[in-house]
């Protein structure tokens, strides 16, 4: 079972990026019932707006999120959908 919570993802992102204007973390695991969703961990969606992302390409914004969550992902994130924008 995954040790990851929405609170853990949110606090990790806030600590790493600091200047977050909007953040929504949603557990979507229930949409992926069955072996793929249950066995490997949890499915998450992160919607984030951050000053540091202003002017960055979509790929660079996603990299910021992945870099911030590098210590959390192995704890049970199977899939991560990211909607990221600058402010």
Give a label for each model feature.
Residues 1-87:
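N-terminal, polar/charged subdomain of small-to-medium soluble alpha/beta proteins
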């Amino acid at each position: 079972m995954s040790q990851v919570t929405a609170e853990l993802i949110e606090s990790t992102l806030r600590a790493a990026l600091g200047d977050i204007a909007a953040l929504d973390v949603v557990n979507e695991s229930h949409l992926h019932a069955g072996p793929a969703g249950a066995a490997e961990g949890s499915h998450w969606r992160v919607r984030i707006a951050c000053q540091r992302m202003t002017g960055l390409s979509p790929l660079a914004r996603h990299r910021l999120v992945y870099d911030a969550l590098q210590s959390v992902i192995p704890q049970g994130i199977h899939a991560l959908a990211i909607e990221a924008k600058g402010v």
